[in-house]
């Protein structure tokens, strides 16, 4: 007897197959990280179409990002070709919520509204600024950004201007400005849009309005509802744990009294509550649809058992309602290395060590594009941009800008430049660090961290810049403001990484759905993860639990190699008062033991000392040179010039930034140590086996020719 294999279920595990073959009707797929959710839902769509349950044009699948939508469309096309389907699965409509609403509103608007036109606001900034001005609220750029964000949250949460004050009070929400002021701006903003911002016969809509008007059109016009529901019979929603009340309203309008809905999600990956996202719709799905098929996917095909085990331990300690849906993932890959934990004296030491570890991974064959450094807040990227630049490793900042490309840093450098030009008016005895902070204070470097998210991002970036200045002053005690600016601009100019094939630097919020062979989770100190504003709500509060889920998301991005680290102080020589993240208490070796064990960890990561003056090395550059940058060294300046000329020529030939060939500090070390052979060259900081294979013969030839020239001259 010949068994007939269904090509749409071949290769699926038992749980995936159950989800794919579930009958039409409500289906809830609870899919843990790395369990193949996209594979499962695309195969389910293909099964429903291929079995004749629904036509391709009657399926609407919605995602949260264009990238996810494109991936799903691509998989559906490939699946149709692979099984030689009569129907082209690739024509299934796969859109984001906003894109779907945009299409529907353009079609139904004339019937519902009439001749009044509408325009979509690409950005609400200018209109929010006008609204603030109209209610006599003086709002700077950061305030306007925070107001816009708060309006987005309110609309996503189905909270109007008149309910805003009571709503935020009821849930204890931290607001960037006085709640009554925000409500006034919100109301003025809606009024301005309704009047077309002064354009006759036009209504302005923001992206949330697309959803609001689409839902209202279907809810209030029976003909519109009938036409839409006749067109779309089957719905699939990805990442359902991230649905907002507004998006759920649209989905409910689409469905009407039908139940042909498949949702996929993981409440343990709910990390976007600041946008209005709520896992309650996923958690309540079986209650709303008592006959629903519920399938749990717990076989993790992404990560090694070691990574999976760590993720399970982190989420096992969760509290609250979301914790009731926690998974016990089972790693399906071959075993790999155990996750490592590292404690460092300060943040520069942590960054330098991470960069060195990344260099070793690359040396042993890991592609830079398969490595990521993940952190809680964007301002943390600066130390890693600096450290990777020092060792000549290209990087890209995902979901944000490089440190020196951020608008607030450009503004700060311009303000410092203007202050330097007026230096004659500056108190001659003022410490340079105080001068810098005095210049940065009006730009947002306040004594207390602001509440608003945009203002807080600015504050964190300016704080990082001020501490960079402190580092430079520590290395160069006689530095003045023009000299400091020159040093900072040198750092900025050195950072022009390629955008491909580089190490990824990203915040934890920017990496959902992504994965790498090697992941470094950095800055894991209490107050950073969980962040201090979450701790203010209580140790077992929902904001703290969301921070735990952020760590869980970070861990589950790693396929094979995972390192977790933290620093005891922010700056070299600072008071080592930080504690490791409380989320590590039950998972990191030696955590929670006696003080002696804690001291032994610190000793293993003690700060390196200068080989000349024996003082602590406080910057990645100093660590690279194995000496303070101000300590006198016997550098052959002529050789250094020749090395830089060779590097420039080589970089042009390879079409890469010069630092990717060899960094300035590596060239300085070569001109100082004068290595005579490969054995001596490998001892030079920054010279790996790979670098020697690529450039060793050229470098040694330059050193030898220079030695001959020196002997001839003498």
UniProtKB/Swiss-Prot annotation:
One cellular component (GO) term of this entry: DNA helicase complex
EC class: isomerase
Entry keyword set: ATP-binding, DNA damage, DNA repair, DNA-binding, Helicase, Hydrolase, Isomerase, Nucleotide-binding
EC code(s) of this entry: 5.6.2.4
Cofactor(s) listed in the protein's UniProt record: Mg(2+)
Domain HRDC: 633-713
Region (Disordered): 572-602
Domain UvrD-like helicase C-terminal intervals: 305-560
GO molecular function, one term: DNA binding
Function as written in the Swiss-Prot or TrEMBL entry: DNA-dependent ATPase, stimulated equally by ss- and dsDNA. Has both ATPase and helicase activities.
UniProt family annotation: Belongs to the helicase family. UvrD subfamily.
Protein name in UniProt: ATP-dependent DNA helicase UvrD2
Organism the protein comes from: Mycobacterium leprae (strain TN)
């Amino acid at each position: 007897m010949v068994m007939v294999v269904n090509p749409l279920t071949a290769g699926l595990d038992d749980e995936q197959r159950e989800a794919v073959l579930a009958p039409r009707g409500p289906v809830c797929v609870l899919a843990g990280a790395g369990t193949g959710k996209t594979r499962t839902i695309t195969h389910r769509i293909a099964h429903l179409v291929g079995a004749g349950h629904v036509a391709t044009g009657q399926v609407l699948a919605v995602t949260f990002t264009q990238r996810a939508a494109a991936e799903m469309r691509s998989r559906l096309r490939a699946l149709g070709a692979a099984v030689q389907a009569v129907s082209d699965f690739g024509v299934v409509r796969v859109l984001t919520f906003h894109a779907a609403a945009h299409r529907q509103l353009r079609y139904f608007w004339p019937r519902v509204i009439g001749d009044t036109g509408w325009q979509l606001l690409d950005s609400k900034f200018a209109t929010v600024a006008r609204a603030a001005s109209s209610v006599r609220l003086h709002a700077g750029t950061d305030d306007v950004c925070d107001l816009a964000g708060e309006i987005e949250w309110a609309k996503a949460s189905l909270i109007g201007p008149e309910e805003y004050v009571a709503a935020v009070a009821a849930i204890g929400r931290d607001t960037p400005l006085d709640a009554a002021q925000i409500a006034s701006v919100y109301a003025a903003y809606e009024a301005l849009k309704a009047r077309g911002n002064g354009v006759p016969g036009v209504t302005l809509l923001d992206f949330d309005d697309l959803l609001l008007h689409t839902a209202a059109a279907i809810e209030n016009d029976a003909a519109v509802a009938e036409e839409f529901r006749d067109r779309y019979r089957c719905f699939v929603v990805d990442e359902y744990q991230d649905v907002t009340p507004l998006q759920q309203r649209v989905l409910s309008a689409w469905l009407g009294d039908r139940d042909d809905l498949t949702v996929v999600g993981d409440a343990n990956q709910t990390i976007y509550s600041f946008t209005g996202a709520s896992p309650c719709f996923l958690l309540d799905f079986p209650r709303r649809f008592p006959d629903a098929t519920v399938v749990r996917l717990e076989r993790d095909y992404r990560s090694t058992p070691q990574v999976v085990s760590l993720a399970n331990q982190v989420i096992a300690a969760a509290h609250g309602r979301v914790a009731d849906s926690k998974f016990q993932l089972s790693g399906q890959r071959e075993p790999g290395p155990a996750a490592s934990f590292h404690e460092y004296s300060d943040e520069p030491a942590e960054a330098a060590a991470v960069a060195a570890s990344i260099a070793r991974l690359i040396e042993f064959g890991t592609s830079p594009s398969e490595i990521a450094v993940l952190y809680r807040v964007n301002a943390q990227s600066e130390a890693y941009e600096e450290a990777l630049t020092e060792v000549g490793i290209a990087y890209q900042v995902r979901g944000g800008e490089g440190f020196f490309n951020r608008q607030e840093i450009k503004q700060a450098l311009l303000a410092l430049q203007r202050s330097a030009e007026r230096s004659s008016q500056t108190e001659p005895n003022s410490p340079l660090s105080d001068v810098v902070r005095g210049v940065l204070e009006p730009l947002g470097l306040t004594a207390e961290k602001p509440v608003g998210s945009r203002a807080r991002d600015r504050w964190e970036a300016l704080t990082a810049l001020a501490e960079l200045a402190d580092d430079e002053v520590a290395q160069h005690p006689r530095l003045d403001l023009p000299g400091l600016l020159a040093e900072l601009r040198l750092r900025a100019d050195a950072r022009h990484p390629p955008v491909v094939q580089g190490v990824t630097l990203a915040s934890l919020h920017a990496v959902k759905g992504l994965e790498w062979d090697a992941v470094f989770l950095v800055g894991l100190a209490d107050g950073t993860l969980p962040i201090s504003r979450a701790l203010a709500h209580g140790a077992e509060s929902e904001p703290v639990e969301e921070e735990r889920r952020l760590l869980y998301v970070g861990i589950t991005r790693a396929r094979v190699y995972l390192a977790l680290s933290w620093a005891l102080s922010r700056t070299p020589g600072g008071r080592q008062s930080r504690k490791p993240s409380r989320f590590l208490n039950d998972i990191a070796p030696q955590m929670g033991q006696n003080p002696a064990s804690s001291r032994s960890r610190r000793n293993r990561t003690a700060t390196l000392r200068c080989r000349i003056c024996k003082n602590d090395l406080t910057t990645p550059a100093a660590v690279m040179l194995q000496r303070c940058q101000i300590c006198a060294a016997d550098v052959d300046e002529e050789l250094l010039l020749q090395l830089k000329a060779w590097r420039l020529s080589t970089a042009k030939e390879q079409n890469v930034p010069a630092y990717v060939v060899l960094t300035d500090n590596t060239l300085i070390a070569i001109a100082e140590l004068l290595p005579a052979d490969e054995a001596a060259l490998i001892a030079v900081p920054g010279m790996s086996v790979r670098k020697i294979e690529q450039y060793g013969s050229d470098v040694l030839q330059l050193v030898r020719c220079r030695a001959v020239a020196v002997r001839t001259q003498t």
